[in-house]
């Protein structure tokens, strides 16, 4: 990555940008992209876009979903729904509503991988199971080519190109280009002139990558794709032969090795009638139509991708909401104190599939105080988990004796506090006003320059015509 990524004083991620001489939270960077999309859409539609459906990888945890919602707020839009990408893809395809279909959606993007199993009948889309890997995507295939090129170059010239940022960027671009080309041909040339300088002058890369060689570099990546598919099928209670349709989503599914792996696992020809790069956006538009009431004959029932629970005595995770539970959902359980006369309890909210708390994602902590003195195990504290249709979690704890309650919307994984979000929104609004003013000035200046240029051109044309008439009169 050409930018420095570090942790600030609170341990949150910050990206250092030398050009602007400031640090950015990931939410700010995503907000910039969303703002550009909103501006382009508003220009195209001729009216302001104020709300949106945003898709995310199905295996995003609560913290990542909350960060996505925060990015939408920073961009100045109301996030009406956060939709899982495989579910969006299924909505885009629609499928025949006269029959019951069991569909597997295989979504391999640039940086994440998701797989979902749905039951579709009479316009009702029921997500039965979802699985995935948020650290696996097409970029991993790119890196295999980068390493192949860099290792060969280092063996020949004793120079590691991965230590040079500019050289690494060129390698990465060439690797992605080669990966894309190998989806349609058996071999592709790779040319990188002046990639480095040796003792005798400039050095170059001139080589050819065969598809078979590329595939030999990636067997472990295919294995990592296989496991989530098997898990999703197992969680849905279906076998591979029970699947009626397979939908491929994401540009990385164009790789022949990926398509062949899917065919081997599920002996069906995948549906490819919609562009895999566009199908998720189309599904998001369908979901927006459902929310606005323009599409009344469709219903979507999604699930939570990971188990949710809290830490109990001994560091064990107690699951309240198992993975693949349909959402929205509310689940409660009763807990007690671990010490005599304990006046407060800390609720540590977790997400993940490990039995021990330390192996799972910590979403946040809060404390319920004011518990009356009592022997260990006597007080009763009811803890409730609420997940909304966006997959976002709210947790509450209530002392049954006093009725005292403490609740919190989990934001433990967000990189921005509520105060920071409000400040950034105000800054964005101020900058938006300034940007509009500057754009208006530039537009006026450009129009003036255009008018001046047109006037000068007309004057020249008039002078040329007058000169031509004078010359004609002189000749005659």
Question: PLM ranges: what are they?
Answer:
Residues 1-11, 16-27, 32, 39-469, ...:
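Oxyanion-binding/catalytic loops of NTP- or PPi-dependent enzymes
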């Amino acid at each position: 990555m050409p930018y420095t990524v570090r942790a600030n004083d609170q341990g949150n991620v910050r990206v250092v940008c030398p050009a602007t001489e400031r640090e950015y939270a990931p939410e700010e960077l995503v907000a910039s992209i969303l703002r550009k999309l909103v501006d382009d859409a508003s220009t195209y539609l001729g009216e302001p876009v104020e709300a949106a459906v945003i898709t995310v990888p199905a295996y995003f945890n609560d913290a990542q979903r909350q960060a996505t919602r925060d990015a939408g707020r920073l961009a100045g839009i109301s996030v009406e729904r956060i939709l899982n990408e495989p579910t969006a893809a299924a909505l885009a395809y629609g499928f025949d509503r006269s029959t019951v279909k069991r569909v597997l959606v295989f979504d391999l993007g640039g940086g994440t991988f998701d797989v979902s199993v749905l039951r579709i009948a009479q316009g009702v889309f029921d997500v039965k199971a979802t699985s995935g890997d948020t650290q696996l995507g097409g970029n991993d295939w790119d890196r295999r080519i980068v390493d192949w090129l860099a290792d060969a170059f280092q063996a020949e010239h004793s120079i590691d190109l991965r230590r040079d940022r500019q050289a690494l960027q060129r390698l990465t671009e060439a690797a992605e280009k080669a990966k894309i080309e190998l989806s349609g041909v058996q071999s592709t040339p790779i040319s990188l002139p002046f990639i480095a300088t040796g003792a005798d002058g400039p050095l170059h890369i001139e080589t050819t990558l065969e598809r078979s060689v590329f595939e030999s570099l990636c067997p472990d990546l295919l294995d990592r794709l296989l496991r989530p598919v098997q898990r999703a099928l197992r969680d849905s209670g279906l076998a591979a032969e029970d699947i009626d349709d397979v939908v491929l989503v994401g540009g990385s599914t164009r790789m022949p090795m990926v398509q062949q792996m899917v065919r081997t696992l599920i002996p069906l020809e995948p549906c490819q009638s919609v562009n895999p790069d566009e199908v998720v956006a189309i599904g998001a538009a369908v979901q927006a139509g459902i929310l606005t009431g323009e599409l009344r004959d469709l219903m979507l029932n999604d699930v939570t991708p990971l188990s949710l629970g809290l830490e109990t005595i001994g560091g064990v995770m107690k699951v309240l909401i198992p993975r693949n539970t349909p959402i929205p959902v509310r689940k409660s359980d009763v807990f007690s104190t671990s010490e005599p006369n304990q006046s407060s309890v800390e609720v540590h909210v977790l997400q993940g599939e490990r039995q021990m708390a330390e192996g799972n994602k910590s979403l946040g902590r809060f404390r319920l105080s004011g518990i009356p003195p009592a022997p260990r195990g006597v007080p009763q504290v009811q803890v409730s988990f609420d997940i909304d249709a966006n997959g976002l979690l709210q947790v509450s704890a209530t002392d049954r004796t006093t009725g005292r309650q403490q609740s919190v919307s989990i934001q433990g994984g967000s990189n921005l506090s509520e105060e920071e979000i409000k400040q950034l929104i105000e800054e964005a609004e101020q900058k938006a006003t300034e940007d509009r003013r500057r754009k208006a000035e530039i537009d006026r200046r450009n129009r003036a320059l255009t008018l001046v240029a047109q006037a000068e051109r007309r004057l020249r044309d008039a002078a040329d015509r007058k000169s031509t008439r004078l010359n004609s009169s002189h000749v005659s």
